[in-house]
């Protein structure tokens, strides 16, 4: 599933029209249609922020939306790029993970440890 299909499913689940989305981001409904049909790439990060707020997405929905946009663009969201570039430790961590190609189970354990540290 690409960004457009994911977004369409999410929009329909929230019972929101393409026109409502277009109004929120101050664009034409045709753009929303083109994004959903894969004729255009994902919305800009600025537009995504407006959409996330308007749709009142859960954290999981928001995370998935940004992930699908990043996959479609072939690059990380701007704020993640800035964080990684600014923090050598974050860069090293990602470099180490990529080099060692850890499996899902190991990555899930690392995520759980990080979340536990943040919540403490």
Locate predicted features:
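A short, Lys/Arg-rich alpha-helix, primarily the initiator
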Residues: 1-13, 107
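Conserved hydrophobic/aromatic packing and binding residues within compact polymer-binding modules
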Residues: 7, 11, 21-22, 32-35
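Short alpha-helical "recognition helix" segments of helix-turn-helix
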Residues: 19-22, 51
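Recognition helix of helix-turn-helix/homeodomain-like DNA-binding domains
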Residues: 26-42
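DNA major-groove recognition helix of helix-turn-helix/homeodomain DNA-binding modules
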Residues: 43-64
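Interfacial/linker helices and their anchor residues that mediate assembly or domain coupling
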Residues: 70-120
